[in-house]
């Protein structure tokens, strides 16, 4: 049996459900409005909008990159893909929840395409690094795409193959990005929401490979 203390020293290994922290029933309180555009952070969202969860390292820089994209209606940061319900940031950073730091992207498909958002996703980080992103090491920094329907999932998987071909030409390893149906999403604490808009000189570890995804 692997103990929780051993997981803490192995930042590259996900916990099992039995090892994960128990969490709590109550959800994290979040601001009503996006700090940048004033739109609601939580559902229900206007009819016709679509959603996706992207994880590409520390969610501060990832969220800023995504809210800046044309056609993105609102963004929020949180945790997904693990076992612990309603985790805190410290719990996620412990490696004992199984969650990844993710950005909820709500977008208008009449103003941008899912394929365009995938291009931003692949080019904005290094998806070959496994349980880390640059100097940020831990399972919470793994690369993930959590999709809301079959069409999104198929498009994400096709784009992964296309980007893998381009990365191979540049000498990069295999993509480690997880692509899966959307799991429960838990909003992060209020101070994490739109963090780099509130703290313009704050830490941003986002960095791509320089490889482009062909149109």
From Swiss-Prot:
Coiled coil: none annotated. It catalyses: L-methionyl-[protein] + [thioredoxin]-disulfide + H2O = L-methionyl-(S)-S-oxide-[protein] + [thioredoxin]-dithiol; [thioredoxin]-disulfide + L-methionine + H2O = L-methionine (S)-S-oxide + [thioredoxin]-dithiol. Keywords: Oxidoreductase. The active site is at 58. The keyword Magnesium does not apply. GO terms for biological process: cellular response to oxidative stress; protein modification process. One of its GO terms (cellular component) is cytoplasm. Gene3D superfamilies: Peptide methionine sulphoxide reductase MsrA. Belongs to the MsrA Met sulfoxide reductase family. Has an important function as a repair enzyme for proteins that have been inactivated by oxidation. Catalyzes the reversible oxidation-reduction of methionine sulfoxide in proteins to methionine. This is Peptide methionine sulfoxide reductase MsrA. It comes from Pseudomonas aeruginosa (strain UCBPP-PA14).
């Amino acid at each position: 049996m692997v103990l929780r203390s051993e997981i803490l020293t192995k930042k590259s290994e996900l916990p099992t459900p039995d090892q994960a922290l128990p969490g709590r029933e109550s959800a994290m309180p979040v601001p009503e409005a996006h700090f940048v555009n004033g739109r609601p952070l939580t559902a229900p969202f206007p009819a016709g909008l679509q959603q996706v969860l992207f994880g590409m390292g520390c969610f501060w820089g990832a969220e800023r990159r995504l809210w800046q994209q044309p056609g993105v209606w609102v963004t929020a940061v949180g945790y997904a893909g693990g076992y612990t319900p309603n985790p805190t940031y410290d719990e996620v950073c412990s490696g004992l929840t199984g969650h990844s730091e993710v950005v909820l992207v709500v977008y208008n498909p009449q103003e941008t395409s899912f394929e365009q958002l995938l291009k931003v996703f692949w080019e904005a980080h290094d998806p070959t690094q496994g349980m880390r992103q640059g100097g940020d090491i831990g399972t919470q920094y793994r690369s993930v795409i959590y999709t809301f329907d079959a069409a999104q999932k198929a498009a994400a998987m096709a784009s992964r193959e296309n980007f893998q071909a381009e990365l191979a030409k540049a000498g990069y390893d295999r993509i480690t990005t997880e692509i899966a149906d959307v799991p429960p999403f838990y909003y992060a604490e209020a101070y994490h929401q739109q963090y780099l808009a509130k703290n313009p000189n704050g830490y941003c570890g986002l960095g791509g490979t320089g490889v482009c995804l062909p149109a």
